Amino acid sequence: MSKVFDAKVLAVYMVAPNTYYMEFDAPDIARLAVPGQFVHVRCGETNDPLLRRPISIHMVSRPKGVLALLFRVVGKGTEILSQQKPGDRVNMMGPLGRGFTLPLPGSKVAVAAGGIGAAPLVFLVQELANIKCQVTVYLGARDKRSILCDGQFIQMEAEVVIATDDGSLGFKGTVPELMKRHMDWRKTAMTYVCGPGIMMKEISTMLAEADVPGEVSLEERMGCGVGACLSCAVKISHHGQISNKRACFEGPVFPSWQVVWE
């Protein structure tokens, strides 16, 4: 069950343009969290901004009780959060949402990340490494400076293949284009995806055509974070029936073949 905590900031620094890494002393969240879940963060001490911000869990250290977040500054709330200092306290709810489904130990899996979508996938690859999975990470961004988490994935002994839109690092093109050239669909037991909607839509179509199971982590605007306000509803198809599901409660992770992409 998720709870509300005042977590002490342990570290904060910029890792890429407008992108920040933060560590918190949050033993209860670190103990309970699974890959794909998020925390709902109160970014300041006043009511401006009023709403909390959902931020995916980047990594945890359960022995140390440390929670790590990786986020991009996109507005007032995340800008305020990025200005916190070690020793400050940040109010957060968590862990929230449905996380990723882990495959059988030793499985060959693919992980596709675009931009800040790499953030929740580090925790996932950490857990996949713990069960001896063979992991290939398809990592993309606009340019070399915007590539995130490649070093962390490599430290976890994942194979990392990079694509940049401008060709400044790795393959010139998109992550879906890279996967078409590189991926062995027949030997892939599971694929996990997080990134821009257009990327996730294209990869989901590819997975359906190859009959490969996959899960996507959706990044939706959220109000309450606990399923009450319905502001994060997404269309899901199940056995031919389309219904609205709450990204904060039934998600943010959904089977790739169930998402009705706009």
UniProtKB/Swiss-Prot annotation:
GO molecular function: 2 iron, 2 sulfur cluster binding; electron transfer activity; flavin adenine dinucleotide binding; metal ion binding; oxidoreductase activity
Principal location listed in the UniProt entry: cytoplasm
Keyword field: 2Fe-2S, Cytoplasm, Electron transport, FAD, Flavoprotein, Iron, Iron-sulfur, Metal-binding, Pyrimidine biosynthesis, Transport
CC cofactor note: Binds 1 FAD per subunit. Binds 1 [2Fe-2S] cluster per subunit.
Family matches, as InterPro entries: Cbr1-like_FAD-bd_dom, Cyt_c3_hydrogenase_gsu, Dihydroorotate_DH_ele_sf, Dihydroorotate_DH_Fe-S-bd, Dihydroorotate_DHASE_ETsu, FAD-bd_FR_type, FNR_nucleotide-bd, OxRdtase_FAD/NAD-bd
PROSITE patterns named in the record: FAD_FR
FAD-binding FR-type domain residues: 2-102
CDD domains: DHOD_e_trans
Residue positions binding FAD: R53, P54, I55, S56, L70, F71, R72, G77, T78
Pathway: Pyrimidine metabolism; UMP biosynthesis via de novo pathway; orotate from (S)-dihydroorotate (NAD(+) route): step 1/1
Names of the cofactor(s): FAD; [2Fe-2S] cluster
Compartments reported by the entry: Cytoplasm
SUPFAM superfamilies: Ferredoxin reductase-like, C-terminal NADP-linked domain, Riboflavin synthase domain-like
Record's signal peptide: none
Subunit structure: Heterotetramer of 2 PyrK and 2 PyrD type B subunits. However, the metal reductase complex seems to be composed of a heterooctamer of 4 PyrK and 4 PyrD subunits.
Function text: Responsible for channeling the electrons from the oxidation of dihydroorotate from the FMN redox center in the PyrD type B subunit to the ultimate electron acceptor NAD(+).
Family in the record: Belongs to the PyrK family.
Annotated protein name in UniProt: Dihydroorotate dehydrogenase B (NAD(+)), electron transfer subunit
